[in-house]
Amino acid sequence: ELRNKGLMAIAVSLIAILIYIALRFEWRFALAAIISEIHDVVITLGAISLFKIDVNLDTLAAVLTVLGYSLNDTIIIFDRIREGIKTSKKTELAPIINESVSATLSRTVLTSGLTLATVVILYFFGGEMIQGFSLALIVGIIAGTLSSIFVASPTLLWFKFSVLEFRNKEIEKAKRKQDKERNRAMYEKGTV
C-alpha cells in the first residue's frame, strides 16, 4: 500500500511540475524537465532497489526531495536559457544552451557539492535509521545535478525548439501587454 501511495505521490508531483513549467516557460521546456525528473526518479529508485533499502516514508520523502532539488536546478538553467534566448544575437539554440549551462555550472556544482557533503555526513553520523534516506538522497542529488545539466537542456534540442519563433512570441506578448497598459491608462483618464 505504501508503494502504491508513493508512486501516486510521485505521479501527481510530476503532473504538477509539467503544468507549472508549461505555464512558466513553454511546453518543450516542460517535457524536457519531466524527462529529466523521470531520469532522476528511476536512478534513485534503482539505487533503493540495488542497495536493498527499505521502502518506507523516509525513502519516499527522499525521492520527493530529489524531485524538488532537481527541479530547482533545472528551472535555474532553463531560466538562464530563456534569458539567453531573449538577449543573445544567436539564432541557434545549441550555443545559447552551452553558454547558459556554462554560466550556471559553478553555482550548480557548488550548491550540489555542499548539499551532498551535508547528506554524506548525515549518512555516516546520523545513525542506522536515517542511512536509507541519506543514501537515496546522495544518489538522487548526484543524478539530479547531472540530469539538469546533461539531460534537461539537450532535450530541448530534440524537440526542435526554435529561437526565432520564441522571440516572435515574446514580441507579441510585449505588444499585447503594452496595448493593455495603454488601454488601461486611457480608461483611468476617462478618454475611452
Predicted regions span which residues?
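Pore- and gate-forming transmembrane helices of large, multi-pass membrane proteins
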Residues: 1-2, 6, 90-125, 135, ...
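Internal alpha-helical transmembrane segments of multipass membrane proteins
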Residues: 3-43, 47, 112-124
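Alpha-helical transmembrane segments of multi-pass membrane proteins
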Residues: 13, 17-20, 65-72, 140-144, ...
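Short helix-capping/hinge motifs at transmembrane helix termini and TM-loop junctions
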Residues: 24-27, 51-53, 125-127, 160-161
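Transmembrane alpha-helix boundary/anchor motif
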Residues: 26, 42, 46, 70, ...
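Hydrophobic transmembrane alpha-helices and their membrane-interface caps
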Residues: 29-81
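Transmembrane alpha-helix detector for multi-pass membrane proteins
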Residues: 60-80, 102, 106, 111-118, ...
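Hydrophobic alpha-helical transmembrane segments of membrane transport and translocation systems
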Residues: 125-192
